[in-house]
């Protein structure tokens, strides 16, 4: 019998942990109606509760990165994993919106300690040429968590209730967190060797970036071409997860009076679109366009047309068209992965990680802001208008924000390795 390498087992467990991290991030969307009733919470309060997850996630990014470097992946994943478990269990048994908000904050901070440490583990345990492929694999597998938070979550809520639908995954997350602790045994010599290989490769790959921009050792935020990528990420990711992470099912249930299961099925197509798009856009950018900006342009145009179409609906468009539009939201919005990579490609290795981490944190701040604003606007419009009118007004806001993101694309320099162009002005 062939023995499975320990690093492969660890990789598998990290993938499973990431599935549960994304599940816990998005699973509140399917239980909005339950939360409003059980917690006696208006839409604005739910928006603030949900945004707490993303503020905490964003705030934890830098500490997680530092801890992964200083105390190692094993301790970081274990500590933050336990925090995420505690948050999920607290949320499952929350008796009011205040307790639920603190629970989501704990869950956000805890699940923030999985993605970055996973990348750190890949960079030290695998060869440099394997890194990009494995990153794509763990991201695609993780998106299964988004898929499970839709129709499967709706079915589970109907069977065991929303509280146990959070408690059960929390227990499973605890099991995998403990398993990761026992599987990840320090191997300093190998880690150092692999880490040196990664550093050498990154230095060679980004030499063009240093030459083109002339910013080695300087603060990235002082350069104007950083901000179009950051603003684009804030707007696109904020709109994406504000809708799919909280309001995507409620829109269908309240506006068109369809069942929770049907709404969950439609929401599932966002996850399917993200899984397909995560692989499609990378191949299109690397092998065919050999450029990043055209992919971002196509993706943003697609988002703009999708949201504009949703604004136009005054009646339920039917299951087929609704599923196609939700799929479009996923496949076009997942170009945020390309945008995030641009921050790494534009800057020298000394500051590329910090630049990428800042863009990543901004993405989650965007979600927190948009979820809060969306909840407030829903309460405002629902005082005198129908749910459909309220959501159409919100979709107009989303469309305008995506239009601003499209404008940002025109200010982005091309960052594809070997084709980096210096912006017109600094």
Could you describe each region identified by the protein language model?
Residues 1-3, 188-230, 425-426:
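Juxtamembrane intracellular "pre-TM" segments in multi-pass secondary transporters
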Residues 28-30, 223-281, 367-375:
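Extracytoplasmic gate region of multi-pass secondary transporters
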Residues 59-98:
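Conserved MFS/SLC helix-loop-helix module at the cytosolic interface between two early adjacent transmembrane helices
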Residues 70-80, 286-301:
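Cytoplasmic membrane-interface "Motif A"-like loop-to-helix N-cap segments
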Residues 82-95, 301-315:
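C-terminal ends and interior cores of transmembrane alpha-helices
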Residues 87, 98-106, 320-328:
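Paired small-residue
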Residues 103-144:
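Cytoplasmic helix-loop-helix junction between adjacent transmembrane helices
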Residues 138-191:
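Helix-loop-helix hairpin linking two adjacent transmembrane segments in secondary transporters
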